[in-house]
Amino acid sequence: MRVNGRNLTNLRFADDIVLIANHPNTASKMLQELVQKCSEVGLEINTGKTKVLRNRLADPSKVYFGSPSSTTQLDDVDEYIYLGRQINAHNNLMPEIHRRRRAAWAAFNGSKNTTDSITDKKIRVNLFDSIVLPALTYGSEAWTFNKALSERVRITHASLERRLVGITLTQQRERDLHREDIRVMSQVRDPLNFVKKRKLGWAGHVARRKDGRWTTLMTEWRPWNWKRYVGRTPMRWTDSLRKEITTRDADGEVITPWSTIAKDRKEWLAVIRRNTTNS
């Protein structure tokens, strides 16, 4: 994939590697080269964990994994867990949100015995915010949020809050308690503010980098040579930043883009504080 004049062929984090190719034959050759390089240093690729994920325009030909003794056809998948985050061929974030919800409940239930035995409210709140909230929002720096996804996160967090303070949904309704009332009782962080703060913090790091990393290049990339799909353009990661942070005049014309503001660390920290009150 060509991005701003450079070819993006792989992503690497420790021994977790993604190869990016425009044709299955190219992918097979790249895999063979990787196998060869790994064997030179005594490493082997796990064929059981190596899968093929394609977009809807990809050639359906099979990808093969070769070794000196045998050749294996790799399985195609519609989704894959990479670095703890589920990615899929449709760029749909909802399955990952469901995973985060399950992870948050697992974290809550796993720490329940500890929190139930603690009477100090401040410690209980700190445990919740440091164990359950990160499980619910893991990887949220890279989320492209819309109202439906935000509501899913908010509802899950509200359920966890009720469990923390010992109130069921029925009891909440009988006592005519609103979301704000439960928040006063729980004193935990607001999840959507927490997500926004993490995203803004990450956006600032990306904008200020000057070492040519792919995260920055992909954020700035405009694929002018690609045709747009028919229909409404999917929401992009930077759309919320343009809408909420970019400054405009009375006619809606851009005065200062968010990426320019983010290059000034002090000014960006002020932006984060203004946009994430009480997070």
Curated annotation (Swiss-Prot):
PROSITE patterns in the cross-refs: RT_POL
Residues in Reverse transcriptase domain copies: 1-87
Stretches that traverse the bilayer: none
InterPro entries: DNA/RNA_pol_sf, RT_dom
Pfam families: RVT_1 (PF00078)
Protein name per the record: Putative uncharacterized transposon-derived protein F52C9.6
